[in-house]
Each structure stands twice: as C-alpha cells, then as structure tokens.
Amino acid sequence: MPLARLAKEIGVRATLDHPLLELNKLLLDEMKQLRDLGVYVGTYCQPMIPSLYQPVADPMETVRTIKEIGPDRCIIGSDFGQVLHMDAVDGMRVFIRALLGFGIKPDDVKIMLKDNPAKLMWLDEN
C-alpha cells in the first residue's frame, strides 16, 4: 500500500499485475484498497482458463474480481504466448469470449482492453 499511496501522491499511474496468481494472491479487499488509490487491477486469462501451467482454474474468480473492482479500474490481458501456451492473440480471443460468456458486457470489455490501458500509458489525453 505505501507504494500505491506514493504513486497517487506524485501522479504516477500504476497497475497491479496478477493479483489472482496463487503465488502472490491478494484478497478482494486488498485489491479494492489499491483501486481506491487509483491503481488499475490487471486480470489475465491464465487464472481463468485451464492450461499446462495451471490445470485447474476458476473462471468465476476473475469474473467476480472484475465485477467487484469495476471495469473502470481493471485491465485485461491474455498473458499467453509462452512455451506450452497458445499464442497471445488466440489467448486473448478465448479470454474475451469467456468473459462475454460469463456475463461481462461488451462495453466493459472495451473499457478494460482499450480505454484503461490507454489511460495507464497517458495516451488518453490530446
């Protein structure tokens, strides 16, 4: 939390990567605290879609996280393209289809896939 507070204080935009990864999993309340400090929460298909690296996955955990944090503070990415995974483009297609299938609205997918990353990289200003 101290780093997120400092980032907010000095105007740095930040993202929290892999909060659902078992190695460094955060509680939803911790993610909400970071969100409230202006941090974007990264959600990736790896914890949602079974793979050789993670043979058991709970897609609803990712969906719950997006709904609880709010799409306006989430970023989505495939995190695929590694050895033994599908390539990044196919991974993203599968991830988006899964999100839509589990009830995430198309407009919210656009926000998380296009709008929020642009904001994070200061590409949203003219």
Feature-to-residue mapping (PLM):
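Catalytic beta/alpha-barrel core
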Residues: 15-23
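Short, surface-exposed connector motifs at secondary-structure boundaries
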Residues: 9-15, 101
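Ligand-binding pocket scaffold of soluble enzyme catalytic domains
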Residues: 42-43, 119
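Mid-to-C-terminal alpha-helical segments outside catalytic/metal-binding sites
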Residues: 92-126
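Structural preference for beta-strand elements that scaffold enzyme active sites
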Residues: 13-15, 38-42, 73-75
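Alpha-helix-loop-beta-strand connector modules within alpha/beta enzyme cores
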Residues: 7-11, 66-69
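Short acidic/histidine-rich active-site segments
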Residues: 44, 69-88
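Histidine/acidic-residue-rich catalytic or RNA/ligand-binding cores of hydrolases
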Residues: 1-7, 25-34, 51-64, 81-97, ...
